[in-house]
Amino acid sequence: MVSTFSRQDQNYKNDDLNQPSKEGRFGKYGGQYVPETLMPALFELETAASNAWKDKLFVKELNHLLKTYVGRETPLYEAKRLTEHYKTKHATTRIWLKREDLNHTGAHKINNALGQALLAIRMGKKRIIAETGAGQHGVATATVCARFGMKCIIYMGAEDIKRQSLNVFRMKLLGAEVKVVNSGTATLKDATSEAIRDWVSNVETTHYILGSVAGPHPFPKIVRDFHAVIGEETKKQCQESFGSLPDILLACVGGGSNAMGLFHPFIKETSVRLIGVEAAGSGVDTDKHAATITKGSVGILHGSMSLLLQDDNGQVQEAHSISAGLDYPGVGPEHSHLKDIGRAEYGSVTDQEALDALRLVSELEGIIPALETSHAFAWLDKLCPTLEKDTHIVINCSGRGDKDVNTVASSLDI
């Protein structure tokens, strides 16, 4: 089997969509599974974020920087040749791309990095740490640290450094110190573990800009809320472009931040299908994949309860994806919750399917998507033949593929 699809019966109530709880739970997922030394920092961060969103000056500064520094709002672009490619006898599927790849630094990651940097300033923290896999979150964090004159340390796995040498250079050029992580699989999971260890040791002076909707509460909510601008803009742009809500939202899922940013403003719009696409790697029936929602079970990783890839003894297993940004054995707790209650659907595609989609989108639209994003595009092959009426699909084009050129060049025969 090369790909899978998971859709639960819809069994949610309105309360299921108002998440997280005061305890930081998304249903049974989430929480704070951290050393006692981090609890005051998490409480401080939760309070700072809550107060910041109520502060008109904070919101004004954030919106000003999103516009003048990041380049928002990003366009909603109709991919007409891709639409023509997927047209069937039964339906014309109009495909729209939310162009997060056009943000400053080339991906959605800067929405969250900028917001958390402003929170760090409010808390008086001048040292910033972050983890990165594909390098995009590292670049975004290094960028905002340069903008605000903050010390920046980025943890990155040795394996990912090999795959993403261009982004490593960009981080260093921006003034960040890149710390190589050789432990474990030397990928994103291990980089995150090292960043958390640093934070435990330096919590008084340091803010950890976690890059996905994972980790202990309040990180999943904070990261989601800073990325929700993606979905808020999309909702408005859909009304302007075709006069209604979209029928389907489609995004890749590793930890799940770009998907959650797109999905969140539509959570209560239950006519809109939410579809996340994970990395099936060499296939979900092998041991080389990162399809956490599809194949995982409940466990605890990096301070949060969620679905994980783990063995019968609860040991976290290695994940695999050609995409460094999806090469993670966990997923954000809200995604696990949305899957359980049937509000969102999740599938997975292989490395080869993602590569084929990257090539197709490049040739048809003149847009080279990131390998992460290409997983979402690949799902169109499975989705479009099932549609029986004219449908508007919005794909979150979460990042550009410049960083992946070396990997793609060694994998595609061009």
Swiss-Prot record:
One of its GO terms (molecular function) is tryptophan synthase activity. Keywords: Amino-acid biosynthesis, Aromatic amino acid biosynthesis, Lyase, Pyridoxal phosphate, Tryptophan biosynthesis. It is an enzyme of class 4 (lyase). It catalyses: (1S,2R)-1-C-(indol-3-yl)glycerol 3-phosphate + L-serine = D-glyceraldehyde 3-phosphate + L-tryptophan + H2O. It holds the Pfam family PALP. Residues 10-26 have a biased composition (Basic and acidic residues). The modification N6-(pyridoxal phosphate)lysine is found at K109. Its EC number is 4.2.1.20. Belongs to the TrpB family. This is Tryptophan synthase beta chain. The lineage of its organism: Bacteria, Bacillati, Cyanobacteriota, Cyanophyceae, Synechococcales.
